[in-house]
Design a protein with these regions (language model features):
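A helix-coil-helix interface module used to build multimeric assemblies
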Residues: 1-149, 153-162, 166-167
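Amphipathic, heptad-repeat alpha-helical segments used for oligomerization and assembly
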Residues: 166-174
């Protein structure tokens, strides 16, 4: 019952934030304090249970990784769309001859498709770097608590799966 109330309260807070009706104040130092305060205002002491077995350090580290993971995915999707557009243009303009430059000087004629394919290869390497970054980012720190873990019996694997992390941080200090 309490878990459902917390979940519903968080959904209401998310809605308020998205609609721009959530009141932020400098008196509360970060988003976590804002959310916990709003939840406690809605639910009383039940709202304080939001961070049971989860320190604010835990929450910040986890939120940062979730934020970065979403950003990486958006950037990767954008680069993929750009690659598709370049390939489509290269296929459409496969006979188009354009000037090629070296050291900012006209060098020789080249095919536009060749230049566009070059950009796609570079984008491919960028996407590989993003995939590596995502893999390194997508490790769940939640459960590390403030420093050396929590004494409460928590199921980190269940949380990992629910949040879509590939692995659990093997050391709470990392």
């Amino acid at each position: 019952a309490e878990a459902d109330a917390i979940r519903e309260g968080l959904e209401e807070i998310r809605k308020d934030i998205r609609e721009g009706t959530f009141h932020f104040t400098a008196a509360k130092e970060d988003i976590h304090l804002h959310i916990e305060s709003a939840l406690t205002e809605k639910l009383g002491d039940t709202g304080r249970k939001l961070h049971t077995a989860r320190s604010r350090n835990d929450q910040v580290a986890t939120d940062l990784r979730l934020f970065c993971r979403r950003a990486i995915d958006r950037i990767d999707a954008g680069i993929l769309e750009l690659q598709k557009a370049f390939l489509e243009m290269g296929n459409r303009e496969h006979d188009l001859i354009i000037p090629a430059y070296t050291h900012l000087r006209l060098a020789q004629p080249d095919l536009a498709a060749h230049q566009l394919k070059d950009r796609c290869e570079k984008f491919h390497r960028d996407r590989q770097r993003l995939a590596d970054c995502r893999q390194r980012t997508n490790i769940m720190p939640l459960g590390s608590a403030a420093l050396a873990g929590t004494s409460l019996p928590i199921d980190r694997s269940k949380t990992q799966t629910a949040l879509g992390f590939d692995a659990i941080a093997p050391n709470s200090l990392d």
